[in-house]
Amino acid sequence: MPKMKTKSSAKKRFKITASGKVKVAAAGKRHGMIKRSNKFIRDARGTMVLSDQDAKKVIQYYLPNGF
């Protein structure tokens, strides 16, 4: 059976840290920010780390080669 390919869309959205955690940008920031609270805008800045369960699934299905 051939080796699984990495999903190209996942390469652009997820980064795996040296310790094996998965970093991702916070969602909900494309438009409509005028009605959001300052706390939401501040908390959505930068990146966040996925939970262990979600990270396991992302690596297993979308990033099998560890991109």
From Swiss-Prot:
One of its GO terms (cellular component) is cytosolic large ribosomal subunit. GO terms for biological process: translation. Pfam families: Ribosomal_L35p. Keywords: Ribonucleoprotein, Ribosomal protein. The keyword Ribosomal protein applies. GO terms for molecular function: structural constituent of ribosome. Coiled coil: none annotated. HAMAP family: Ribosomal_bL35. PANTHER family: 54S RIBOSOMAL PROTEIN BL35M, LARGE RIBOSOMAL SUBUNIT PROTEIN BL35M. Belongs to the bacterial ribosomal protein bL35 family. This is Large ribosomal subunit protein bL35. It comes from Bartonella quintana (strain Toulouse) (Rochalimaea quintana).
